[in-house]
């Protein structure tokens, strides 16, 4: 069986909303570069038919994410990360337009503090998690959740980030 080519990121746009830019930049040094590295690491796990042409990571705040969560998921509260896959939309020269990820600063900061981790570590985990959702991974079934967690844990180790699921496994 012939292996499919690995995915390659053409363009990863990182958009930091002006209302939260100071907080994001203060919490995560070299923000754009770190977010791009985490996204590329997650993209490197896929083997789709097409090269990625473009994806966006939008670093926002709770108000915007709450609105998006309400509009698209019917949940009137902020969440840490939302992923909006584009499906199989092809751009110029057959490049796949992967989709968008939106991450809420306030929720990320609260969760990081509650879990005893840095905002940077939690952000990079959510970038990886969000990209895996864009690639079609899900965690609705336990087998797929375990696979997704394994991929995340392996990728995060490359950034010097401890297994984010270790406490959940100990409680189970």
Language model region names:
Residues 1-123, 134-172:
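An acidic/histidine-cluster motif and surrounding catalytic segment
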């Amino acid at each position: 069986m012939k292996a499919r080519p690995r995915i390659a990121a053409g363009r990863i746009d990182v958009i930091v909303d002006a209302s939260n830019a100071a907080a994001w930049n203060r919490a995560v040094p070299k923000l754009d570069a770190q977010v791009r590295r985490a996204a590329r690491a997650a993209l490197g796990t896929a083997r789709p038919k097409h090269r990625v042409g473009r994806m966006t990571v939008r670093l926002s705040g709770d108000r915007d994410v709450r609105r998006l969560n309400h509009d698209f998921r019917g949940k009137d509260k902020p969440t840490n990360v939302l992923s909006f896959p584009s499906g199989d939309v092809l751009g110029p020269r057959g490049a796949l337009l992967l989709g968008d990820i939106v991450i809420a600063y306030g929720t990320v900061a609260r969760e990081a503090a509650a879990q005893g981790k840095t905002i940077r570590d939690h952000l990079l985990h959510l970038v990886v998690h969000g990209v895996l959702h864009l690639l079609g991974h899900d965690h609705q079934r336990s087998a797929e959740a375990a696979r997704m967690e394994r991929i995340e844990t392996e990728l995060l180790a490359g950034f010097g980030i401890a297994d984010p699921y270790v406490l959940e496994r100990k409680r189970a």
